[in-house]
Amino acid sequence: MLSILSAGIAPALALLSYIYLKDKITEPIWLIIRMFILGALLVLPIMFIQYAISSEFNYDSIFIEAFFQIALLEEFFKWFVFMFVIYQHEEFDNHYDGIVYASSLSLGFASIENILYLITNGIEYAFLRAVFPVSSHALFGIIMGYYLGKAKTHTNYKKKNLTLAFLLPFLLHGIYNFILKGFSSFTLILTPFMVLLWIIALYRLKRANENTIIN
């Protein structure tokens, strides 16, 4: 069990450390841990809602499952928790901060989801899980956090950026799920898609850091 827990949480901690260490102005560790824990606590309620929806409606559509049962619920709840808990917090005062806190939230979610999967299916899937699901949650978190940070620091376009902070991760997550569930040789399509996401995310990291004001 210890090996599964380690394999389940290590990729998320590694990615979060990378994002945190890129920050020009370090955020309080306790607040990052808080967001990570809140992300972890989202997993079981969302799984329950997803199960209830699939049981009640009994649809047979990969598209609906990928975009609405999975991506919509997960990204909306992450976005909502961010807005409720951290958006008005005094420590959220720079563009890059949005990325740090949104990534913490996303990777907390990814860690528990990953541990549950490895418990059910075996530790031999740990590498693939790290490369695809865990890193994808980090990338969606970076994109969400980029626009949340932009909304906080560029108030002229606040509504637009708050909308993009939810809409873009939702659409990208939906595409990711659709590829994963809709194609038998999904790695051939998912790999270039993930590379594209990494390029976008790294660019967003760079831009947000450039916009960070050091007092």
From Swiss-Prot:
Its main location: membrane. GO terms for cellular component: plasma membrane. InterPro entries: Peptidase_PrsW_arch/bac, PrsW. It is found in: Cell membrane. It is a multi-pass membrane protein. Its EC number is 3.4.-.-. Involved in the degradation of specific anti-sigma factors. Responsible for Site-1 cleavage of the RsiW anti-sigma factor. This results, after two other proteolytic steps catalyzed by the RasP and ClpXP proteases, in the release of SigW and the transcription activation of the genes under the control of the sigma-W factor. This is Protease PrsW. It comes from Oceanobacillus iheyensis (strain DSM 14371 / CIP 107618 / JCM 11309 / KCTC 3954 / HTE831). The lineage of its organism: Bacteria, Bacillati, Bacillota, Bacilli, Bacillales.
